[in-house]
């Protein structure tokens, strides 16, 4: 009986070894590349325990979400463009808070942080309009060579940080060592699994002249697991384990320990059959299909002079729009304000932002969740008519609502 048990265990062991070897060597050689995709949602979620000079402050929970739209090459980009480069226009917004007891951070109408960038075939990301996001640039990136499980490569990337939320972003170069693990399935999608490690090193010769002048140095370690879409080359999931310390010239040291997670999601498809007909019946509402989604332009919208306060009667139009938007249960709405050109660029920018937020608040007051609105102001930078006539200026004073998809 003992001899029989031994034989069974021996053959079971041999089978397991054979299965393992076959599984490893059956993995095909692969070529990683960024092929681009249509519109997508990028989410960066951090859960970091913060310590100031060794004293525990709390769990810093932060979520940065964005709606990113594929776009044509911007007119401002003239040289150094590869035909395979992909260009994107992003609207980022931040939800942040400090938790000690797991309480949920309150949310509401979001202010857009605009961003424009391009991504090369190897995953290198170059900023065109930089307001601090995305915070990981050129990560992950891919080699030109064919890869087998266990193969390694190194590549530089940039991480944009603002540890104290001062509104001053410091860009830190990082040298990342990648390892290709295997091909696998994730939620029904073919993906590549990659691991990555790098060290945070800042200070001395590594210095960002445009960054936080109070930041003296930074050091730490990162270890990440990455799932990359085989179809698009997008990193659909990154889970980064972090331990890093930022030192300031005033003697303050801030340490963060925890995780940073990145997700790629895709916006819901909007069923336009139920909304195009009622929209066509609304007065002074122009409906247009754009790369971001269906855009509603509220024409001749009347505000008090130099104010975000609507004139009496305008709320009736907004109520009719809200009735339609309520029938779109999952989509986000981008509300973008525009002004005529009066020569006061900064004033126009502020006024356009305030008017966008005023419209979003009015729509939210009808029962649409406030956290579905992203507000953006473009001042007088996007005219649709000449500002040399009263009629043209009236057309330029408008608010656009895009149903993002």
What is the role of each PLM region?
Residues 20-26:
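Sec/Tat signal peptide C-region and signal peptidase I cleavage site
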Residues 249, 260-332:
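Periplasmic peptidoglycan-binding/tethering modules of Gram-negative envelope proteins
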Residues 109, 146-149, 314-317, 321, ...:
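Stable alpha-helical elements in mature extracytoplasmic
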Residues 27-284, 288:
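Signature of exported/secreted
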Residues 1-11:
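Bacterial N-terminal signal peptides that target proteins for export
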Residues 308-313, 326-330, 334-405:
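Periplasmic OmpA-like peptidoglycan-binding domain that tethers envelope proteins to the cell wall
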Residues 9-19:
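Bacterial N-terminal signal peptides
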Residues 160-162, 200-201, 302-304, 339-343, ...:
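Solvent-exposed loop/turn segments at secondary-structure junctions
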